[in-house]
C-alpha cells in the first residue's frame, strides 16, 4: 500500500486571488483604508486572513493593541453585472472617506469588477481630486489576470512612488523588505538579533507595517534587507529593493537566505563584507557556532543513532533539502531513506534526486516502496502530512523554514522533544 498524504499539489506558478495581496501590502499601515470592489463574500477572505494573522502575531509576542486598517466591500450585486458597479464604488469611497477619514485609499478589484469592465482607475482619479487624498488602484482583477503577489507588489510599488522621498541617511540603520509574519515574526526577529552584532537598528518593515505619515522617512535607512526566500516572492521583493536603490539611494544586501547553519554563516559574512566590518562578522559566526553546537551536544544523547526518513513532495525551487540533511547529520541521526512523493514530473524529480544525492548517501525510493519503511523508523520528517498511518511520529517541514541560528535550534529542539515522547503513540508536530 502506498503512502497517502494531504493536499498533494505541484505547480510552478501561483494561482490565487490578488485582493488579499492588496490588503496585506497595507494591512498595518495606519492612516490607510482598503476597499474591495467586490461582492460582500470576497471581503470574508480578508477578514479570515486578518483573524489568522492576529492569532499568529499574539502567539509570537506582538502587542495586543495591534490594529489592522479598515477593509470595506463595495457590495457588488447581480444587478451590477448589467449596469456596472462604478456608482456603487463611488458611494463606497464616499462612505469610507466620511467614516474613517483615511490619508490614503487603496482599491482592490475582484473578478466580478473585471468581468463587468468597470473603469476603477478612472473612478480612483476622480475621487482623488474630489477628496484630496491619494487613491491607489491596481492593474489586476481577483483571479482573472493576477494572483496574490501581483496585488501585493503593485501596492508596494505605488506606495513607494507616491510617498517616498530622498532623505538624509541615518547611520547604522536598516529597512526590512517583505512580510514573513511581520515585525513580530520569527524571520524579522532573528534578523534584528543578528544585526545587533553590527550595532544596526531596524527602522521599519515595508510594505504593510509603516504608518502612511511615516513612509517618507524610511528612505533614511542606510540599507535594506530582503526577507525573502526563493522563487517569485524573492524576485518581486528584489524589484522593490532595486527601486529603493535606484531612486532613493538605499542599497540592499544581496544574495542571502539564512536557512540552515551554512547559509547563516554565508549571510553573516556577506553582511560583514557589505558593511566593511568583516571582523565583526567573524566574531558573530564564532558566537553563533558556539551556541548552536552547544545545544546540539546537549540533545545528542537522545538523537544519536535514531533512525529516520525524509519524505519530500515539493519542487526544488520551493524546498531545498540541504539544510534539513545538515541538521540530521549534526544530531548524528541515521537517514534510512529519502522518499520522493509521486507528484513530481520527470524534470522536477530529476532535479530533486540530484539535490538529495549531493547531500546524502541514503537510498532514494518512491511513495509505494516507502510505506513499510515508515513503520520501522523512529521519526519521519515530511513536507506533506501522512494520513494513512497514525502510529508514526511525524515532523512537518514548513514551506517557510525558520531562519538563522535560532531557527536551527528550534528545529533541533522539535526533533529532540518528538523523540522524547513516551510510548508508541504517533502524531504530527509542526515546526
Each model region followed by its residue ranges:
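An N-terminal assembly and electron-transfer interface module characteristic of large anaerobic redox
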Residues: 1-431
Amino acid at each position: 500500500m502506498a503512502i497517502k498524504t494531504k493536499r498533494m499539489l505541484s505547480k510552478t506558478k501561483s494561482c490565487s486571488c490578488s485582493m488579499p495581496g492588496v490588503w496585506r501590502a497595507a494591512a498595518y499601515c495606519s492612516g490607510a483604508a482598503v476597499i474591495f470592489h467586490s461582492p460582500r463574500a470576497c471581503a470574508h477572505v480578508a477578514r479570515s486572513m486578518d483573524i489568522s494573522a492576529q492569532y499568529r502575531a499574539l502567539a509570537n509576542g506582538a502587542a495586543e493593541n495591534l490594529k489592522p486598517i479598515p477593509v470595506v466591500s463595495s457590495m457588488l450585486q447581480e444587478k451590477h453585472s448589467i449596469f456596472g458597479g462604478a456608482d456603487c464604488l463611488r458611494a463606497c469611497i464616499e462612505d469610507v472617506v466620511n467614516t474613517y477619514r483615511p490619508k490614503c485609499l487603496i482599491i482592490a478589484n475582484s473578478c466580478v469588477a473585471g468581468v463587468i469592465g468597470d473603469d476603477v482607475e478612472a473612478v480612483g482619479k476622480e475621487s482623488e481630486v474630489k477628496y484630496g487624498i491619494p487613491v491607489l488602484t491596481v492593474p489586476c482583477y481577483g483571479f482573472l489576470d493576477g494572483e496574490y503577489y501581483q496585488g501585493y507588489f503593485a501596492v508596494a510599488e505605488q506606495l513607494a512612488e507616491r510617498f517616498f522621498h530622498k532623505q538624509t541617511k541615518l547611520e547604522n540603520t536598516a529597512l526590512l523588505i517583505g512580510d514573513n509574519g511581520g515585525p513580530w515574526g520569527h524571520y524579522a526577529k532573528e534578523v534584528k538579533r543578528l544585526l545587533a552584532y553590527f550595532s544596526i537598528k531596524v527602522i521599519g518593515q515595508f510594505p504593510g507595517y509603516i504608518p502612511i505619515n511615516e513612509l517618507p522617512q524610511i528612505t533614511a535607512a542606510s540599507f535594506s534587507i530582503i526577507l525573502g526566500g526563493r522563487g517569485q516572492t524573492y524576485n518581486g521583493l528584489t524589484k522593490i529593493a532595486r527601486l529603493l536603490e535606484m531612486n532613493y539611494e538605499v542599497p540592499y544586501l544581496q544574495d542571502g537566505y539564512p536557512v540552515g547553519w551554512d547559509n547563516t554563516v554565508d549571510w553573516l559574512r556577506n553582511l560583514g563584507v557589505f558593511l566593511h566590518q568583516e571582523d565583526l562578522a567573524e566574531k558573530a559566526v564564532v558566537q553563533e557556532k558556539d551556541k548552536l553546537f552547544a545545544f546540539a551536544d546537549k540533545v545528542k544523547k537522545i538523537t544519536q543513532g535514531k533512525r529516520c526518513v525524509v519524505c519530500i513532495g515539493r519542487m526544488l525551487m520551493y524546498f531545498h533539502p540541504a539544510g534539513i540533511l545538515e541538521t540530521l547529520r549534526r544530531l548524528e541521526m541515521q537517514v534510512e531513506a529519502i522518499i520522493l512523493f509521486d507528484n513530481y514530473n520527470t524534470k522536477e524529480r530529476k532535479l530533486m534526486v540530484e539535490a538529495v544525492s549531493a547531500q546524502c548517501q541514503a537510498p532514494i525510493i518512491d511513495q509505494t516502496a516507502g510505506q513499510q519503511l515508515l513503520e520501522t523508523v523512529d521519526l519521519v520528517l515530511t513536507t506533506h502530512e501522512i494520513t494513512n498511518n497514525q502510529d508514526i511520529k511525524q515532523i512537518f517541514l514548513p514551506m517557510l523554514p525558520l531562519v538563522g541560528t535560532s531557527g536551527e535550534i528550534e528545529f533541533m529542539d522539535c526533533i529532540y522533544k518528538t523523540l522524547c515522547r513516551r510510548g508508541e503513540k504517533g502524531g504530527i508536530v509542526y515546526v
